[in-house]
Amino acid sequence: MNPVKFYLLTDTHYFEESLGVEGKAFEDYMQKEQYFMKGSSAIIKSVFDRISKDTETNIVIIPGDLSKNGELESHKSFIKELYALKESGKKIFVITAGHDYGSAFAFKNDQWIDVEGTEFSALTDMYKDFGHGEALAFDEMTHSYMAQITENVRMLAICCDSENQPKGAMDDRLMAWAKEQLDKAKADNCSVFVICHYPIIPPVPVFDLVGDTKVKEWRKVATFLADNDVELVLTGHMHIQSINEFYSENGNRLIDVCTACLVGSPAKYRKITVDENAILNVETLDVGDFGGVPEGVDAQEYFDNQFRNSIVTRVTRALDGGKGIVKHLKKLGKKFVLTGKVGTLGRILFIRLDKSLKNKPIKDLIGEVGLAIFTGDMPYVEGTPVHTALCKVLKRFSFVIKKVEPKLQKGDVKTDLKEMLLNTVGNNKGYSDNNAEFQLKK
């Protein structure tokens, strides 16, 4: 791949605060939200200001979910920030995604309120100065485009989150259009990397079993890209830090660098460099203090506390509702999650746990493991107390797993649920999800 250097940030979820971020309904909503609505503008301004001062890196790429939920005023305010960044000398390339059009809302007087949203068709004109306005090719149906990034490098922006096709799908028509652009680039001796809002490769193994966490038919899409000389794809959507490799049956490799939400934990963005020797360097940068962190509070901890609490809230709210015995069991489960200790769970399952886990509240462990997965470089590898405990739990339920695995199988790819779960909580890939180097083809 030819040399190129740029900043990568995604899922900015800009929200225009004048629309309404107050009241009981807002506070209740934020209990389960990973990222900040109130403060998103300050976070983005802070990061853009930092990027604008880097005179050696002049390209900025943002693969989708630019606004909170398609609010027209949020788009207008975010575009002003993009223009300010562009005036500092940056070339900016964006794509839009599902949160950039459709139903929009805000909060006022303790209630949810509807606010003016944005039509998908309007996004073309709104963001024309940030990518597709000067594109070599533009697909009207999806807003995908091919752009000349440097003299010898092109970027294929695949938008598979449009209103004109199933979300997360790269259908045959779009694939044929992409193939045409890739063939033209090859004929012009240009390297190509891809951006797509949806991950191409599941960010963690267990996401292969979860819908809407990666493109549909991801192996087919990954094979198509790898076998058409694309080695690098940059993605978002899942608000997670991950780097994964895929090899096609022809032996061609695709690297998917998925980046977290900018305005919420883990609050990261990337600096990507491919040098003259085709060495890909992925560097992760912290959002850090943006001027809205309470005095005396560490910025990263401020972000992480919001995420940990949101994970626990989502788990406990899932235990609400039901009827009869189901409602009663859910109520007991919710109380156990909120007040129970890991050691008690171990005794119930007849498994021996490490001393470091016995007195840990269950809700704290849930928050810690969830945060670790989304931050990347998951620490619960072989030999750690959590890994050992999970192995014992999986062994205890092995009879259930054996019955479930065949039902989870997709095509010829067998499902090993134990390995999936262990490799989801522990990074066993041999490289970091945050800072890594790869040798690409020259």
What are these regions (language model features)?
Residues 1, 294-442:
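Non-catalytic terminal accessory segments
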Residues 11, 60, 65, 78, ...:
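Divalent metal-coordination and catalytic microenvironments
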Residues 13, 66-67, 98-101, 199, ...:
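Catalytic metal-binding/acid-base residues of hydrolase active sites
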